[in-house]
């Protein structure tokens, strides 16, 4: 039964006939009903496994909701949604593009720095890239008539590869940079490996992370060289878009304060 439920879960996550979270809840619920989730308790005297009770099955099914790591991921995801809905993520991205976007290489570093700044607060590289970085990149490429099926080498390929590569680096630098990080940490702790906290994780990866972060846009520039070398128009566009945002709104200020407080408490 367990193998059937597990196989059904995998197929459901691949085909996605409904949201993945809902598929996971169905799998856990079915496991609870058939009492195949928790490991049976073996009687030391007889060596015979005891029957799993309803209480044990329910306790196993709900155990994840009391897991501190799960709540950490949930809180960070909420902060990530706040960045997108408040517009703070877009403001940060436009500011950096306006300052560094006068050349194609500088624009690549602007995208990389934006992702690095957002990484501690948005534990999903997909949400970070799709919710904040990609909308900016997709607005820049048409300015140079660069599309996936038309002139991609002008600048579009370079910018998208930088966004893809740097988000992998930033996801590794911070414990809250990607959802799998704290989960992997918990699995390590259960295996007897001393678990790191936010600060020790950051310091441990920092020497390698700095090198990777610095060379990634540069290597992408070398191996996926854009035909457009200078891009003052992009910096001007970003500056105009940034001005249209006006002063920081109440929601953006509140979001920034929450982010700083959360980061301080995580450290």
Language model features with spans:
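Transmembrane alpha-helix interface/packing and boundary motifs in multi-pass membrane proteins
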Residues: 10-18, 114-124, 164-175, 265-267
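Juxtamembrane and boundary regions of transmembrane helices in multi-pass small-molecule transporters
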Residues: 125-129, 144-257
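Transmembrane helix-loop junctions at the membrane interface of multipass transporters and ion channels
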Residues: 50, 54-55, 59-63, 183-200, ...
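Hydrophobic alpha-helical transmembrane segments
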Residues: 2-3, 7, 22-25, 70, ...
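Interfacial loop-to-helix junctions that mark the boundaries of transmembrane helices
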Residues: 1, 12-19, 55-68, 194-207, ...
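Membrane-embedded alpha-helical segments and adjacent helix-loop junctions characteristic
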Residues: 22-148
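Flexible hinge motifs at transmembrane-helix junctions and intramembrane kinks/re-entrant loops
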Residues: 8-26, 36, 61, 213, ...
């Amino acid at each position: 039964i367990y193998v059937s439920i597990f196989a059904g879960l995998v197929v459901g996550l691949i085909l996605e006939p409904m949201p993945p979270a809902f598929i996971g809840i169905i799998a856990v619920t079915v496991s609870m009903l058939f009492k195949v989730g928790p490991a049976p308790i073996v009687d030391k005297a007889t060596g015979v496994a005891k029957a799993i009770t309803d209480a044990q099955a329910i306790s196993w099914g709900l155990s994840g909701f009391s897991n501190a790591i799960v709540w950490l991921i949930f809180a960070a995801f909420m902060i990530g949604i706040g960045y997108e809905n408040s517009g703070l993520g877009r403001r940060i991205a436009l500011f950096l593009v306006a300052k560094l976007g006068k050349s194609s290489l500088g624009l690549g570093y602007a995208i990389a720095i934006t992702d690095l700044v957002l990484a501690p607060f948005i534990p999903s590289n997909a949400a970070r890239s799709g919710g904040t970085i990609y909308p900016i990149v997709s607005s820049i490429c048409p300015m140079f008539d660069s599309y996936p099926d038309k002139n991609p080498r002008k600048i579009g390929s370079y910018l998208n590869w930088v966004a893809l590569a740097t988000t992998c680096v930033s996801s590794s630098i911070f414990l809250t940079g990607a959802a799998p990080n704290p989960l992997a940490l918990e699995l390590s702790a259960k295996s007897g490996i001393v678990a790191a906290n936010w600060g020790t994780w950051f310091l441990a990866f920092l020497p390698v992370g700095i090198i990777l972060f610095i060379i990634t846009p540069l290597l992408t520039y070398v191996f996926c060289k854009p035909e457009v070398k200078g891009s003052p128009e992009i910096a001007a566009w970003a500056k105009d878009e940034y001005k249209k945002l006006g002063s920081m709104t109440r929601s953006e200020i509140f979001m920034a304060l929450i982010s700083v407080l959360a980061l301080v408490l995580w450290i």
